[in-house]
């Protein structure tokens, strides 16, 4: 038995893959661990609607009933959004969840893994995980970065989550040979903010150019994925200095309460939401919608290439 035996792809998605039509993978951690019910369910429907509106097929991923699900029906989306007993699954957790039949929400790393197994090359998310602040002492580095180094999926995101050490995250990606491509920008975005103070490797002018870059990477046999950095729309951007103050307060709270490991990111995002009066969640929604839109356009262009 191989890992592909655990794969369960919705018929509509499988048909699109077989016919070479554009498909965009979506994660489920943002649903189960990123926002409350029923707002998360509305968000899930909105994202899928945006993907379809751009001419692609949405493929939300999860682990349910011992299966790697690619495409969720209404009942399965409800399960992920109500999040009763739903765990957060990274690569290390996959075998446990498959063996025990537990329900798990997919992180960036796990979504990349599942998408690759299904033959999906394009994935939209909010922001990737990376090297945490203080990682020189804690060694807290997201598995997302190793997945980007080895799994052939392009991840469209609003940069790295601003709670991270963005400079070290970019250094790690460079070491692992992962290209960081900006969507019509020279600046690497910091999730809620359009600029982080760091630069992308390449500024691509449009979806067609990005599609050609990633296809060429895989055509010539280079391993791994690509990080496509798509800044949050200007009207939803939050002030960088204000966000740094908020993030530092949330980090202090996490340290005081002994929060670490996989609990760190959900804790920080929840407290940042509270400290910004909900403003950060509104920005999070809009950047995720924008990433889904751009990812769909890249997927459409990718499927046109010979």
Cite the ranges covered by each PLM segment.
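A C-terminal functional module that forms or caps the active site or interfaces directly
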Residues: 224-290
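Solvent-exposed alpha-helices and their adjacent loops that cap or buttress functional pockets
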Residues: 15-18, 23-24, 114-117, 122-124, ...
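Anionic-ligand binding region
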Residues: 194-219
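Divalent-metal (Mg2+/Mn2+/Ca2+)-assisted nucleotide/phosphate chemistry catalytic cores
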Residues: 73-152
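N- or domain-start disorder-to-order transition segments that initiate the globular core
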Residues: 1-20
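Active-site glycine-rich loop that binds ribose-phosphate moieties when present
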Residues: 105-107, 136-149, 153-174, 207-212
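Glycine-rich nucleotide/cofactor/substrate-binding loop typically near the N-terminus or early
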Residues: 28, 33-35, 41-98, 219-234
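General beta-strand structural signal in soluble alpha/beta enzymes
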Residues: 24-26, 58-63, 104, 122-127, ...
């Amino acid at each position: 038995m191989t890992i592909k035996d655990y794969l369960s792809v919705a018929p509509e998605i499988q048909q699109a893959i077989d016919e070479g039509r554009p498909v965009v993978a979506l994660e489920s951690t943002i649903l189960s661990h990123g926002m409350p019910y029923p707002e998360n369910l509305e968000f899930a429907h909105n994202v899928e609607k945006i993907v379809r509106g751009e001419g692609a097929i949405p493929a939300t991923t999860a682990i349910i009933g011992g299966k790697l699900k690619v495409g969720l029906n209404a009942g399965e989306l409800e399960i992920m959004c109500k999040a009763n007993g739903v765990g957060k699954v990274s690569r290390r957790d996959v075998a446990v969840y498959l063996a025990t039949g537990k329900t798990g929400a997919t992180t960036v790393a796990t979504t990349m893994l599942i998408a690759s197994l299904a033959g999906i090359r394009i994935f939209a998310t909010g922001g990737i995980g990376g090297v945490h602040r203080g990682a020189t002492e804690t060694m807290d580095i997201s598995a997302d970065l190793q997945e980007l180094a080895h799994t052939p999926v392009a991840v469209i995101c609003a940069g790295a989550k601003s709670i991270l050490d963005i400079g070290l995250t970019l250094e790690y990606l460079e070491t692992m040979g992962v290209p960081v491509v900006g969507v019509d920008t020279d600046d690497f975005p910091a999730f809620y903010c359009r600029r982080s103070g760091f630069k992308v490797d390449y500024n691509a002018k449009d979806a067609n150019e990005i599609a050609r870059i990633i296809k060429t990477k895989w055509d010539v046999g280079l391993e791994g994925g690509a990080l496509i950095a798509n800044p949050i729309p200007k009207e939803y951007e939050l002030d960088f200095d204000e966000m740094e103050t908020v993030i530092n307060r949330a980090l202090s709270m996490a340290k005081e309460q002994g929060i670490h490991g996989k609990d760190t990111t959900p804790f920080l995002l929840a407290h940042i939401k509270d400290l910004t009066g909900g403003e950060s969640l509104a920005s999070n929604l809009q950047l995720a919608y924008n990433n889904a839109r751009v990812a769909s356009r890249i997927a459409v262009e990718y499927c046109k290439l010979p």
